[in-house]
UniProtKB/Swiss-Prot annotation:
The keyword Transmembrane helix applies. Residues 141-225 are annotated as: Disordered. Keywords: Host membrane, Membrane, Transmembrane, Transmembrane helix. This is Uncharacterized protein 037L. The keyword Lyase does not apply. It is a single-pass membrane protein. It comes from Invertebrate iridescent virus 3 (IIV-3). Residues 141-158 have a biased composition (Low complexity).
Length: 253
């Protein structure tokens, strides 16, 4: 106590020798942990010589946290660098080859394959090509339209109208003719000029009819053939051409 009081007195003397103090005086009789000063009760202060207990606790707390983090890091490094061992049937430990170790990605992939359901896609048979498959699908979806078949008995030739034979009576052939119509020059049924000239020449009676020729007027009625003709008659090389306007008939001997 004497030393403490003497120290306080010395400090009081040194402070009294200094000029007037402008700092406010805090009259406290307990220790101030924040400023580190001890009040003497008379307005004078003294520096603390010892670290307060709260500061020591704070330092220990942070030190313990730092040491625990460092120990954890060292343990992890040692664990990772330690060789992988596995027990054998004899109880001894043997090293595992690095190739046999399963990586994390492979392990995750195996777990996913085991949990996710396997979806199977339908396989297309190799025999059926894509084009054949498309045609089969179209045949199944589109309605089948059947075309009516023409019977084989009806041939085109049977449908053609037959031309009347020469044995039929001539009157029935010429009865279908109509009255001749005036044809325009250059039309389809127009007669060429040289045929008209020959027709005009033949229509004229011969000037001198020889008596040696047969007289058709004196022939019996059974041998005569009288046919009503409505149209132009052309005789060329023993062939009779009858132009009835709409139709033309050719009679050969």
């Amino acid at each position: 106590m004497n030393a403490a009081t003497s120290g306080i007195q010395l400090n009081a003397q040194t402070l009294s020798q200094q000029p007037a103090m402008n700092t406010p005086l805090i009259h406290r009789s307990f220790r101030d942990d924040y400023t580190g000063l001890v009040s003497a009760g008379d307005g004078l202060y003294k520096r603390k010589l010892k670290v307060p207990s709260t500061t020591r606790c704070n330092k220990f707390k942070w030190c313990s946290i730092g040491w625990s983090i460092g120990a954890l890091i060292i343990f992890l490094v040692y664990k990772l660098e330690k060789p992988h061992v596995q027990p054998t049937s004899n109880g001894n430990l043997s090293l595992i080859e690095p190739e046999k170790l399963v990586s994390e990605s492979q392990l995750i992939q195996k777990i996913l394959n085991a949990t996710t359901p396997q979806t199977t896609t339908p396989e297309i048979p190799s025999s059926t090509e894509p084009q054949e498959l498309v045609t089969e699908i179209l045949n199944t979806t589109t309605p089948q339209t059947t075309t009516p078949e023409i019977p084989s008995s009806t041939e085109p030739q049977e449908l053609v109208t037959e031309i009347p034979s020469s044995t039929e009576p001539q009157e029935e052939i010429f009865s279908i003719f109509k009255s001749p119509k005036p044809e325009e020059p250059g039309g389809i049924n127009s007669i060429p000029q040289y045929e008209q000239e020959s027709n005009n020449v033949e229509d004229e009676p011969p000037p001198n009819k020889p008596e040696e020729e047969e007289d058709h007027d004196n022939q019996p009625l059974e041998e005569r053939h009288t046919v009503p003709i409505l149209g132009d008659v052309i005789i060329r090389n023993k062939t009779i051409i009858i132009d009835g306007g709409n139709e033309t008939i050719i009679i050969k001997p």
